[in-house]
Design a protein with these regions (language model features):
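Short, low-complexity, glycine-enriched hydrophobic/amphipathic alpha-helices that associate
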Residues: 54-101
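Extended, charge-rich low-complexity interaction segments
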Residues: 60-75, 172-192
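Solvent-exposed alpha-helical segments within well-ordered globular domains of core cellular machineries
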Residues: 17-20, 24, 108, 112, ...
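Amphipathic, membrane-inserting segments
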Residues: 112-174
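Short cationic amphipathic helices and targeting signals
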Residues: 2-10, 119-126
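Membrane-engaging insertion elements
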Residues: 86-124
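A common structural junction motif
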Residues: 1, 23-32, 138-146
């Protein structure tokens, strides 16, 4: 089964140390790392720092291949900024309060757990049991969370749809404001 795993570190060097270790041995008898990325919360913006792609095929390359890139793009884009100040609009649209409390949403969890200055390693991993992969972080000051990759793909699709709707709403409001401004200018000229 494929999972998205997020490991948050308060110290960036530990994230890079874990990344290097995993990059040098991405395939074991119990797990295969398909992709991974290091991201850092820089003043509320999620910034990619390093990435790795094993070149291994995923179960369904058509939607899984760009999953981490899409998730990081959402976390680092306008929706991620909305989430940065708290769970915010998007998380409220995607998950209800009980889901946010039990960490079933990558976006909601990230907004609460990846604090400014902190770094995370996010990996797409094929594994039957997360225990062996989790052991790679033993002795490190970090928090490890796992999500079913199919659920994250659905969450990313929902976030993308919301982002498109917000962009359309913003364009419509700008268009209406310009129209109102033109109408006001015309009325002003008529009054002269």
């Amino acid at each position: 089964m494929e999972y998205v795993t997020m490991v948050t570190f308060p110290v960036e060097s530990q994230a890079h140390e874990a990344f290097s270790h995993l990059k040098n041995k991405p395939v074991t008898s119990s797990y295969t790392i398909l992709q991974m990325v290091i991201v850092k919360n820089v003043d509320g913006n999620v910034v990619p720092k390093d990435g790795f792609d094993s070149g291994q095929d995923t179960t369904d390359d058509t939607w899984m291949g760009g999953l981490l890139g899409a998730a990081v793009g959402i976390l680092g884009g306008p929706i991620g900024i909305l989430l940065g100040g708290g769970v915010g609009l998007l998380a409220g649209s995607l998950v209800d309060e009980s889901d946010a409390a039990d960490n079933t949403s990558l976006l909601a969890y990230s907004s609460r757990s990846l604090l400014p200055g902190q770094t995370a390693l996010i990996a797409l991993v094929q594994e039957d049991d997360s225990a062996d992969f989790d052991m790679q972080f033993e002795g490190m000051d970090c928090a490890v969370m796992h999500w079913d990759a199919a659920e994250i793909a659905d969450e990313v699709d929902q976030a993308d749809q919301i982002q498109k709707e917000l962009a359309k709403e913003a364009r419509d409001k700008l268009r209406a404001q310009r129209k109102a401004d033109r109408h006001e200018a015309i009325e002003k000229k008529r009054a002269e």
